[in-house]
């Protein structure tokens, strides 16, 4: 089963993602599939897409939840699949009931009729997938937006399905390693400043700047980064950039000078 409809959110896949992605996207279109790019910017991928939806920056979550709301209201949700593989679907459906296309249109800058059409096309296609990259991870609602991508795939029954969002076997089975090492828990300890709970041994990266700035026992005074750019990828990157300059010691292992390694 090949993809019939692919919605790429905050992704410039033809240029920056998997090897030879531009060819793969072209083949998707040649098979009769539709490529929809949801991105404020007319990127290289948006330029070759069948449809470019220029959402207002930061409104990705609202747009995606509105699409889910349309699918649920229209009776297109794969409820049998959801009953077998998920918990809490009815609670989620109730929670997003106010995200109507009419209300979201003003926020997202996308006409209500377009939101409705996109939702119907996604849920009704023989196969479809919503795919997102770092573009949706750089705004105030990035966590909700990332969740909404999975939610959209789930209500349409596309998680783990042929032509949908598949789960390939990774080279390194990190979930299994987490279980074996005992690092797969939740809230066993909390961050020093705000008391945010850990998940699988980590706290949100958004705590990094405050842990550097706040004086006291356990204050972060040194940092090692490896092939990463937290100033760009962590929320409120400018605050983190200011905090990095006040560290006692910092090492960055990377091939490039970027927003983080320059410190």
Task: Give names to the regions the model predicted.
Residues 181-186:
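Surface-exposed loop and adjacent secondary-structure segments within mature catalytic domains
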Residues 49, 178-180:
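Short aromatic-enriched loop/helix-cap "lid" or pocket-rim segments at secondary-structure transitions
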Residues 173-176:
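Flexible, small-/acidic-enriched active-site or ligand-binding loops
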Residues 1-170, 188, 192-263:
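Cofactor-pocket helix-loop regions in the catalytic cores of large enzyme subunits
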